[in-house]
């Protein structure tokens, strides 16, 4: 397992960069809102060296390109990109490992005199990074108890148990993600508090003074775009991509195999549904995930919101630059 991958070399500028220009930017929002395009436009308009860090847990996996809408290597060549293609599909992505590796990457970029731009929508991963989450201890016996309960009643029923104990946690954890469901129940039992209570509130200063920009994308605008994007993924070869990755260890039991689109295609390949049903289920799952992302991010008062319906990355990037200038001068 190698989290350290960077797409392109970095060069340190001469002289010392003012501290304010080293503050990371974090671009968040629901899937399909245009975060990656915006990150590139902002990087082009900043009058300083910039390096980009991936904040999408599934884009960390090698070969998972079509179904994650990952920028191509050619698109990533314009600026150094980090934490893309750094895991094999049979590796387990971890919030704690991401916090540590992305944090080290931020500080290495700053040491080179460049500004980090973090871009993605993986909710807990990003908050763990910018708020330096400290994770509660684990207890093997408690975890084993909840895993046994999952085996007894099934993962979807266990998700309902989580909802009864902590509705907010159930809203953000996918109902078919047994590892995170079990972990949340473990934390709740060990601490006697809701899962999120073990983490810092969202109204405290961010780590490194990170500035957060969010793309606001209402469902009536985003949902048709998401369906069209799913259609493009299937047309571009998502099924063949999944078939190839299956030979490299992608399975429904792996973390990568639970990614939206990949899980549905794996079910179809196993004969459990038609490929058309897999496409429809992918659309439904993507829309549900976008709703969870919107719910998570709108609770953070530190986010400066941008209107994704403008659908013009250049115009939105200009708004980001203007906001940075105003707050710096103010």
From Swiss-Prot:
EC number, as in UniProt: 2.5.1.75
Catalytic reactions of this protein: adenosine(37) in tRNA + dimethylallyl diphosphate = N(6)-dimethylallyladenosine(37) in tRNA + diphosphate
UniProt cross-references to Gene3D superfamilies, sorted A to Z: 1.10.20.140, P-loop containing nucleotide triphosphate hydrolases (3.40.50.300)
Interaction with substrate tRNA: annotated segments: 56-59
Site note Interaction with substrate tRNA, residues: 122, 143
GO biological-process terms attached to the record: tRNA modification
Needed cofactors: Mg(2+)
Record's keyword terms, sorted: ATP-binding, Magnesium, Nucleotide-binding, Transferase, tRNA processing
Compositional bias of kind Polar residues: 1-11
Subunit structure: Monomer.
Protein family per UniProt: Belongs to the IPP transferase family.
Name recorded for this polypeptide: tRNA dimethylallyltransferase
């Amino acid at each position: 397992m190698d989290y350290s991958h960077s797409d392109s070399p970095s060069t340190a500028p001469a002289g010392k960069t003012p501290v304010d220009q080293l503050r990371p930017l974090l671009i968040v929002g629901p899937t399909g809102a245009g975060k990656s395009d915006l990150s590139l436009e902002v990087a082009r308009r900043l009058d300083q060296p910039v390096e980009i860090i991936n904040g999408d847990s599934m884009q960390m996996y090698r070969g998972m390109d079509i179904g994650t809408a990952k920028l191509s290597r050619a698109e990533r060549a314009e600026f150094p990109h980090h934490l893309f293609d750094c895991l094999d599909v049979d590796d387990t992505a971890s919030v704690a490992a991401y916090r540590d590796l992305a944090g080290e990457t931020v500080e290495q970029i700053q040491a080179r005199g460049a500004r980090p731009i973090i871009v993605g929508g993986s909710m807990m991963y990003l908050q763990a990074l910018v708020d330096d989450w400290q994770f509660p201890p684990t207890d093997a016996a408690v975890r084993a108890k909840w895993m046994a309960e999952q085996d007894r009643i099934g993962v979807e029923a266990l998700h309902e148990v989580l909802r009864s104990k902590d509705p907010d946690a159930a809203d953000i954890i996918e109902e078919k993600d047994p590892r995170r469901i079990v972990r949340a129940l473990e934390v709740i039992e060990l601490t006697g508090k809701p899962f999120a209570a073990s983490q810092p509130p969202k109204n405290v200063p961010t780590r490194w003074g990170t500035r957060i920009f969010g793309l606001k994308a209402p469902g009536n605008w985003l949902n048709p775009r998401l369906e069209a994007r799913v259609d493009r993924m299937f047309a571009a070869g998502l099924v063949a991509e999944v078939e190839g990755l299956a030979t490299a260890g992608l399975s429904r039991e792996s973390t990568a195999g639970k990614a939206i689109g990949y899980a549905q295609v794996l079910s179809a390949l196993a004969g459990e549904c038609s490929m058309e049903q897999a496409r429809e289920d992918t659309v439904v799952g993507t829309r549900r995930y976008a709703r969870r992302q919107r719910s998570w991010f709108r609770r953070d008062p530190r986010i400066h919101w941008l209107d994704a319906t403008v659908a013009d990355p250049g115009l939105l990037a200009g708004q980001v630059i203007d906001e940075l200038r105003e707050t710096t001068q103010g």
